[in-house]
Amino acid sequence: TLCDKDGKQIATATGAQGSIKVPNVNAWTAETPYLYKAYITLKNKQGASEVIPQRVGFRNVEIKNAQLLVNGKPILVKGANRHEIDPDGGYVVSVERMIQDIKIMKQLNINAVRTCHYPDDPRWYDLCDEYGLYLTAEANLESHGMGYEEKSLAKFPEYLKPHIERNEGNVKSFINHPSIIVWSLGNECGYGVNFETTYDWVKACDKTRPVQYERGGYDSKTDIHCPMYIDYDESEKYCKSDGTKPYIQCEYAHAMGNSEGGFKEYWDLIRKYPKYQGGYIWDFVDQGIRDKSPITGKEIFTYGGDYGRYPASDYNFNCNGIIAPDRRLNPHAYEIQYWQQNVWIKDFDSVNGAFNVYNENFFKNIDDLNLTATIYANGVKLTTVEIPETKGIAPQATKLIKSDALKYAIGEAESKHGKEEITVNFAFASDGSQPLVDKGQVMARQQFIINDYKFEKVPAAVAEEATAKNAKTQKTSNIEVEETNAYVKVSAERMTVTVGKH
């Protein structure tokens, strides 16, 4: 028996096997994760002996014209790799932590996850079905420690069976989840006949999904060209080629340390070339464990090497996430949130208070977002204008908006603060109607400078005299700090850092 999300019966089928036709189906996507519920009932002479409920989503995945299509649309994969890791539970991740991860992903405009490099807790797939995330579901194959090329286990016949068995377990366990749109055969195992045979097995078992493998390269048995850490030039080279496969990097934009300064350039290319459809950032969360420092007693997050020299350690290398172990946002998370946002202001005309709003979604409007424009003068807030005209903008559509209120507010700012820097900050904030998205959460933002900062022009001789006159110097045994009207300079034994004040 199949029921809609409200429990209304749609259709039934009887027998050991059967099929149901669903009229006017509500299709599942990560943007619109509609789920039906199927009840499989086993009966005997006394009646029902067992009832199994199963949530069901209907969607289509295919590759056409070098693009990955979901329900006929060439989606953008705004993805991240996610290891199962918890600062308190280690490899044991609670449902509450999983939901927290999905909430953060929604906040950061992440719509896809690669289950690196193994099948996850079954509850994770249920949650992705429910809340809406696209999954590349990866089998637990990784053997690059044994070597590549001729040393790869993918070339040894005696290892064919485990290659197939591990993918069989992955596919057969999770085949009914609509959130899974791609199967991944494994990670960093080299390439050989074992993967070619495994690819054929998966395609025979499930004809509804593409199959990818990173080491498959351009021409081998992978439906998606999915390399890792390819730079801009090589990415653009493939996009300009006659390659017939979608280009979606399985790992890119490595998020370790002070990172993501080059994220914009990737997304400029993704939005330029149709076959370049995104990628999966490495990776989602710093892999650290909550503990106390043996020296200070304060709480820290530990990593490789903190518990002795064995087993082998790469020290802090696995702390390369968008977010910290306790799920606080790392600074570069905001860069990712911005360049992956789903709504954009274009062609801003400040004189007339006019601009275009582009909805980058493929399946939903932006009626759940409220647009405001806040005007600042030299960083001081002047006023905020509400702009309700964004309602009804269809997916992939653009709407011209003219706001008299914004035009007036900008005019007032220019007349009273004409010598100051004036900016207009647009913000699309959630109305709280979407699951796991808080009311007021800003999902997209842009800033436009309508009056540049006016730097005072001072003759060089005067500037040098003023700088010397106003210089203040402080010294300790190891550090010297010099402060002027123009800069702060900090000097130590072998380094000097100068920070300008303007």
Task: Give residue spans per PLM region.
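Terminal connector regions
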Residues: 42-52, 408-462
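Beta-strand-rich N-terminal accessory domains
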Residues: 425, 430, 456-502
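Extended substrate-binding grooves/exosites of carbohydrate-active enzymes
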Residues: 47-356, 360-383
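Hydrophobic beta-strand positions in extracellular immunoglobulin-like domains
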Residues: 22, 42, 357-361, 375, ...
